[in-house]
Amino acid sequence: MLKLELKRIFSKKINVFAIGLALILAVIFSGFAVTSNRYVDENGNASTGIMATRKLTDNRRAWKGTLTEDELGTVIEQNKNAVTQSSEENAIYGTTLQPIDDIRGFIISVLTPDAEYDESVLNQITEENIQEFYDTYHKNMEKMAEEYGKTSVQKKYLEKKYNEIKLPVEYESYSSWDTMIMYVETYSIILAIIVGFICAGIFADDFQTKADAVFFSTKYGRTKAVKTKILAGVVTTVMIYCMGIILLSVICFGIMGTSGMNTPYQMYQAYSIYIMSYGQYYLLTVVCGFIASMLAASVSMLVAAKMHTISVAVCIPFFLYCLLPFIGRALSGYTTLFNLIPTILTNVQASVKVPLIYQIGNCVFRQIPLVMVMYTVMAIALLPFIYKSFRRYRNK
């Protein structure tokens, strides 16, 4: 029965068009991603072609490894010399400043925990400051834990998380991962909308074609057939999401490379409480996107099962992931509520920057894991209600 239901789904012309559109958009997004990084060569010529990211990685390869205080001191000295000699468009930028851009950003991030990005900090650092760099990092971690921890339990939790950061930091150029995280987030929203549209049709099509009487009169129409429809929705979600993400990832990483997979995210956001490498960060983003698609599928199927039409159901994913963020910004007085909406699943990039935590009893949870658990449970919990909605209709 499952095979037959899947055949119905994937043979429907509008669904084939939607899936084809998803795959075409994956290719288009790949094109944007692989040409989004900027590389300046030794002659000062800037390029953004498909090989720009690999060239950028090669340009920064000399700095791969452990960033000791001595290494950081060399970076500061090189930065000061370069700034006095050239601007970004000059040839010196490509050979002097560009290779250390990531490391410069890391130093600034560590030294300005509560301030905006300020390059002037690099010109104010002394040799003594550099030799005490990681000590300063530790002290600032303690201040951050004290500032964002509202209770003693929260403060201890934040201190524990910060202590998980391995110092000195290991560096490798992470441009491809940083770029991909941005594009995979946007693409996951598109996949969630497409999944919601296709899954809504699973329960609405029988009513639209007036075949519901035949469906309910069959031997398994009251039980197994409905369960099969629900299972088909889950399988369809997995298939579409995996096809799209795998295609996007294979194209982009195949062209840009996977350099920086083990580089800690703290290279970019020094005081993030999400202690992870860029590879783990990408996986987190992909998993959150999958949960978003599963939630979209469950809600769309439930609405379609109750209303017997696809028109309202297809709007649900668009509302959850496109409109709700704007509503949240408009209703700034309800920040606590909007920090737990489904949009977080498709906006991981913004959430990992903020040390937002919640406490229930003596248990402390970070925002993203809490949201992941909440909406995974919700997506699964809605499935029995879909089944019951169809049973209620049949008993009329």
Predicted regions and their residues:
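Internal alpha-helical transmembrane segments
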Residues: 1-40
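Alpha-helical transmembrane segments of multi-pass membrane transporters/translocases
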Residues: 11, 15-18, 22, 292-300, ...
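Membrane-helix interface segments
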Residues: 14, 221-222, 309-314
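Central hydrophobic cores of alpha-helical transmembrane segments
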Residues: 20-23, 311-324, 340-343
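Secretory targeting signals
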Residues: 26-82, 129-206, 227-306, 326, ...
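Transmembrane helix boundary and interhelical loop/hinge segments in multi-pass membrane proteins
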Residues: 199-214, 218, 222
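Short hydrophobic, aromatic-rich alpha-helical segments embedded in or entering the lipid bilayer
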Residues: 336-357
